C-alpha cells in the first residue's frame, strides 16, 4: 500500500520551520536576483549596493558600485543617487523608487543575512550603512571560474546538500578532470587534519554560498544540478553533479593531481 504523503500541517514542528525558512529564502533570493538584473540593465558592471536603514526600517540607496578592482584595490562608484530633476537622465532605465521598494521588502526579514550578501560597510566612517553584494549573473560560470583557478582542467563538481532550519550546508565530494580522472575532496569533518584540499578553506565558503543558492532555487537547480550516485562515497544522501561550462580544448594546461 502506498504511503500517504503528510500534509504541511502534519509535519513535525522542526520540519515545518525548515520548510518555512527555505520558502522565505527562495523567495527573497529570487527578488534579490531580480533587483540585480534591473540594476545591471542600467549599470552592467554593478556588484554592490550601498544603503542605509533608518530607525523606521526604511531603506535609502547611497550608491551603486563595481566589483573591487584588483589593480587599485577598490571599487568604482557607478551611480550616485541625487534629488536633482535635471540629472534624471543619469538614472537610465533604472526605476529608483521601485528598486528601493523591493530593497525594503527583502531587508525586512533575516533571510538574505543568512547568505552573507548583506554586510557592514567596508569603510569605517560609513559603518552605519550596509553593503549588499549582488549575485553573479551566471552562478555556474562563477563556480567553474573559482574552481579552475585552483584546478585548471576541472570539468565538473560532485557535491551534496543538507538543508535544515539553519540553512544549506554543502559537502564537496569530488572533481572530474578533462582527462576523465576523478579527484576526491577530503571531508573536513571526516578528515579534519587533511591538507589535500584542492583549494583554501575560505574558497570553500565562497563556493558553498553560491552552490547553496543554486540548490535552493528550483529553477536553477533544475538547470544546473543533476542527481548522481557514487557507491564509494563515505556519506549518505543524494549527490549532485554540476557540469562546468564548455571550454575550447587545449585552452588550459593539465593540473598536477594524481
Language-model region placement:
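Core catalytic machinery and nucleic-acid-binding channels of phosphodiester-processing enzymes
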Residues: 17, 24, 28-34, 38, ...
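Acidic, metal/cofactor-coordinating or nucleic-acid-engaging core segments within structured domains
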Residues: 157
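Conserved functional acidic sites
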Residues: 49
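Phosphate-interacting basic helix/loop segments used at nucleotide- and nucleic-acid interfaces
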Residues: 28-42, 138-148
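Detector for the mature cores of small, proteolytically processed
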Residues: 3-10, 14, 18, 56-139, ...
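Long, positively charged binding patches that form subdomain-scale interaction surfaces
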Residues: 149-151, 171
